Amino acid sequence: MYIQIINFRLKDVSEEDYAGLCDNLAPSYAAVPGLVQKIWLANSQTGTYGGVYVWRDKQAMEDFARTDLFNSVATHPNLDGVTSAEFDVLPGPTEVTNGLI
């Protein structure tokens, strides 16, 4: 497993319109090879949005970074200050706490 956390702020779009965009994009993400799950994030108090991506492995994440879906989101004019943090998973303690492995 490999974890990626992406955060950004909304620019010139309402949270309601953004939520509609997420609803429309969700089926496309469900079909991404190697993406085990995506958790969609929103904190309207801080204006921070994003997602936690659980990848089969780092290669799956890197393959996704070359897709049209990734590029359309990464360059979207209404997403500002996009950051990405990537992590390996520590399998031992993750299993103890019932995390996905």
Residue positions per predicted region:
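Short arginine-rich
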Residues: 71-76
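Short S/T/G/P-rich N-terminal loop/turn motif that feeds into the first structured element of a domain
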Residues: 1-48, 58-66, 77-101
